[in-house]
Design a protein with these regions (language model features):
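Sec-dependent bacterial lipoprotein signal peptides
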Residues: 1-22
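Conserved functional micro-motifs across diverse proteins
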Residues: 24-195
Length: 195
């Protein structure tokens, strides 16, 4: 004769649920390092730098004769536009989130470093480049790029950090993006970039 199904007590179920939820981790854990996971950005970490969170959407080489890529190279001065022998364009597209209610300054100190210690600073295009990352105030409960902006609605949905890097640095991977908090330089985060 079959046994009637056992009744699970509410207390046992609650204990089991609590155990399962405890495995999820603390959603407020500060993340300061990560690895960008590829073109989808699907597994890209949110990097906490001071009170703001940064996420790499995409990182890749740019081809100036490609139609899409040429738009990222708009509003450069002649000196900025010139690549030295052995250099190429490299782009990192990021989003910045402010979960607080007050506007906060976005980082202005962002660099890329290869495994040989070569460090690259971003080039800031002129105002005519609507994709360029600008270290402006991030609105309270807002983000950069701003919703409904060209960069936000663009193919990468991120603001452009534009670099001139040595081609040899692509052999000295991983490349690491470092972000420094503008209000407290001791607060930093870094992410390994996909190439």
């Amino acid at each position: 004769m079959p046994r009637p199904p056992a009744k699970t007590s509410l207390a046992a179920f609650a204990a089991f649920a609590a155990l399962g939820l405890s495995a999820c981790g603390d959603s407020h854990t500060k993340v300061t390092t990560g690895t960008y996971a590829g073109e989808s950005g699907k597994n890209a970490p949110y990097l906490d730098v001071g009170p703001l969170s940064y996420e790499v959407q995409l990182s890749r080489e740019l081809n100036p004769v490609n139609t899409e890529d040429s738009t990222y190279l708009q509003a450069l001065t002649p000196a900025q536009r010139t690549l030295a022998p052995g250099q190429e364009w490299f782009a990192v597209f990021i989003q910045v989130y402010n979960h607080g209610s007050q506007p906060l300054p976005a980082a202005s100190n962002l660099t890329i470093t290869d495994t040989q210690g070569n460090t690259y600073l971003p080039i800031e295009p002129g105002e005519g480049n609507q994709y360029a990352y600008r270290a402006t105030l991030v609105p309270g409960n807002g983000q950069l790029p701003l919703p409904n902006s060209v960069a936000y609605d663009g193919p990468t949905q991120g603001a452009l950090l534009l670099f001139k890097i040595q081609v040899v640095s692509l052999d000295n991977r991983p490349l690491t993006l470092k972000i420094v908090d503008p209000t407290d330089p001791s607060e930093t985060a870094s992410a390994e970039l996909d190439v």
